[in-house]
A protein has these predicted regions:
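Beta-strand-rich domains and repeat architectures in extracellular enzymes and scaffolds
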Residues: 30-92
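Surface-exposed loop and turn segments in beta-propeller and other repeat-based domains
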Residues: 34-55, 100-116, 155-168, 220-245, ...
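Beta-rich, blade/repeat-based domains predominating
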Residues: 55-69, 112-131, 163-188, 192-193, ...
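Residue position within the beta-strands of beta-propeller blades
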Residues: 74-76, 134-135, 186-188, 265, ...
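Residue-level signature of beta-propeller blades and closely related beta-rich strand-turn architectures
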Residues: 79-81, 138, 190-191, 269, ...
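Beta-propeller blade signature
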Residues: 89-100, 143-152, 204-219, 379-398
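Blade-level signature of beta-propeller repeat domains, shared across WD40, Kelch, NHL, RCC1
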Residues: 350-415
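Cytosolic C-terminal tails of single-pass type I membrane
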Residues: 442-461
């Protein structure tokens, strides 16, 4: 009886431990603030810096962050391409964070608005070798993907003009994910966010949002999903947080599973997440047979990212949080975990995510992105208050670019506990068998009768 109780208790503990797949919601004490600023400060020469402070500091804001294999944090600062007098004084559209200042990368000359190659960067990616993939918006309305070596030399240029829209900067390339196993890049084109509706005297959303597919080997490009429901904002979605309202924006976030089999994408204003097999995207002839699955997510979001552990991270606009879920295991997103929670940033929202693959930290950028979007980039920042933040939190995870390791979400301590409990269970089962054996009635050896004894004696004689 005692052994049975012990075994039952061990099984109960074992069952509860293996259910602990992800830590509870993180508190603010778990989060390290690594950057805070009222306005962006650039590490440039004195003359250029003074011109920037005079003309552009109220308009420059960070959009995307990434971390290379050496732990260097890169930040994009888009030039809005609506006022050359403002844009040309923003020193760098792609920068590294150094001593709480932004240093144009690879140098100031390459970022020069008139003479440099890099005009305006919204989204970009860094591969495991440290190469940078920059979605460049040229001031002449052309679009291209610039690939740079870690030392700042240009490695390759991909012309995207065949699949982008050039009239009045109608293509806004916001995010890119890389499949370097099969040499493909997937890019979200939000389309021109605003379009004047002169009949009603207001600004309305454009419907040119699309997904671009680029073959990195032969440089062929495909544009698809234009005017499809999965690429358009959900106008019926209720706004749950009035302080963090957002315009009706199309495709923005995109994620690639670590096994490179699935693309996940979503318009900004949508609680739907769309999933499509990458095999359908790699050949224009198979696009008509594409099978798009619809999942759910908890909030409108700017950026999403999958990880090497098979987890799905995304920014939540209404909840002002970074959420994480087992995207392949719980397709309804019913058990979302919050990596950061609490509405203590007023009208700031999390907009970008980045992993440090060496340390296992998740970095996320918080800014007033919604102010620029909601006011058609006509409102200046209030530089008397903090506007930009970058935080990091330990998640023991890495980017989707690393090989999949989907079972590593179970902590080492849990694995040790599982092994110990398994040994205890084995020992308990062994003790139970021994106990049952001892309690079993033994057969008594029957003594020979007189006739048998006489027969035995005769045989012996």
């Amino acid at each position: 009886m005692k052994q049975s109780i012990i075994i039952f208790f061990i099984i109960f503990i074992f069952t509860n431990i293996i259910q602990c797949k992800f830590p509870d919601n993180k508190t603010r004490s778990d989060i390290d603030e690594i950057y805070k600023a009222k306005y962006l400060e650039f590490d440039t020469n004195e003359e250029l810096n003074s011109q920037y402070l005079k003309h552009s500091k109220n308009y420059a804001f960070p959009n995307t962050i990434r971390i290379n294999n050496r732990g260097v944090l890169f930040i994009s600062v888009p030039r809005h391409l609506f006022s050359e007098e403002i844009d040309k004084y923003i020193p760098g559209t792609i920068n590294i964070l150094s001593n709480n200042k932004l240093k144009p990368w690879p140098n100031q000359e390459e970022n020069d608005f008139d003479k440099g190659h890099i005009h305006s960067i919204v989204g970009f990616e860094i591969d495991l070798d440290g190469n940078l993939y920059l979605l460049n918006h040229k001031k002449n309305k052309e679009r291209e993907l610039l690939v740079y070596y870690p030392n700042g030399e240009i490695k390759d240029v991909y012309n995207l003009n065949q699949v982008t829209l050039h009239k009045d900067h109608e293509s806004l390339l916001t995010n890119i994910v890389l499949d370097l196993t099969y040499n493909f890049a997937y890019i979200t084109d939000t389309g021109k966010i605003f379009e004047e509706d002169f009949n009603n005297n207001k600004i309305k959303n454009d419907t040119k949002s699309s997904l671009l597919v680029l073959n990195l080997k032969n440089k062929l490009t495909i544009r698809f999903l234009r005017k499809e429901k999965s690429s358009m904002p959900d106008l019926s979605l209720p706004q749950r947080n009035k302080n963090l309202s957002i315009k009706d924006i199309g495709l923005y976030g995109i994620a690639l599973s670590c096994d490179k089999r699935f693309i996940y994408y979503s318009p900004v204003k949508s609680d739907k997440l769309y999933k499509i097999n990458t095999l359908f995207l790699q050949d224009e002839r198979t696009l008509r047979n594409k099978d798009i699955n619809i999942l759910n997510k908890k909030s409108s979001s700017f950026e999403m990212m999958s990880s090497a552990r098979g987890l799905f991270y995304y920014t939540s606009i209404e909840e002002n949080s970074v959420l994480v879920n087992f995207y392949e295991r719980i397709l309804t997103f019913s058990n979302v975990r919050s990596v950061r929670h609490g509405n203590y940033f007023e009208d700031n929202v999390p907009v970008s995510l980045a992993f440090n693959g060496t340390t296992g930290y998740l970095f996320y950028l918080v800014n007033k992105h919604n102010i620029f979007i909601n006011d058609n980039i006509e409102k200046e920042l209030d530089v008397n208050q903090d506007n930009f933040f970058i935080y990091k939190i330990k998640v023991n995870d890495r980017s989707y670019l690393y090989p999949c390791n989907i079972y590593s979400y179970i902590p080492n301590s849990t694995w040790i506990a599982i092994i110990i409990i398994s040994l205890l269970m084995s020992y308990g089962v062994f003790k139970l068998i021994v106990c049952v054996t001892k309690l079993s009635p033994k057969k008594k050896e029957m003594e020979p009768n007189e006739e048998e004894l006489a027969y035995i004696n005769d045989e012996e004689n």
